[in-house]
């Protein structure tokens, strides 16, 4: 029921908080050829992640739960791990693609749980996230394709 949805949203909230912090680190520490493009892209991505953190926490409240707000608690349950010392754009993009793979899987599970609970709003929220993330995966894969040169 709804309790399962809330539990899954708690997990997603913790994961998004760690993902957000990783994106900040990528934004601050990126170096090299792709700096200008990636520095801006990572900023827009962490802004988007921050918005999703807020939406997820508010959804937990709407469903009668209480969202966690301590980072120490997020780190205890998050499946996404903190990343440090990433200055190379390709390493950052690889980490983001791996993270998206995980988040997309979790959001699909939440859609199933929400549908079982008759919670159309949460299912719709997650569907919106999937739509954005699948497009971002496509763009990041295209960006990181090796061997493409301008002629």
Q: For the regions a protein language model found, what residue spans apply to each?
A:
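Disorder-to-helix initiation segments
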Residues: 1-12, 89-92
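Helix-loop segments that flank and shape redox-cofactor active sites
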Residues: 1-4, 19-44, 106-121
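A structural signal for well-ordered alpha-helices, especially hydrophobic packing surfaces
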Residues: 13, 20, 27, 46, ...
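Hydrophobic stripe of amphipathic alpha-helices that form coiled-coil interfaces
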Residues: 23-26, 30-33, 56, 63, ...
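Conserved alpha-helical segments that form or flank metal/cofactor-binding pockets of metalloenzymes
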Residues: 34-72
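Charged, amphipathic alpha-helical segments and their flanking helix caps
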Residues: 36, 43-54, 113-130, 134-139
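Acidic/histidine-rich alpha-helical segments that form the ligand environment
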Residues: 54, 58, 72-128
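Generic C-terminal helix-cap and adjacent flexible tail
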Residues: 145-151
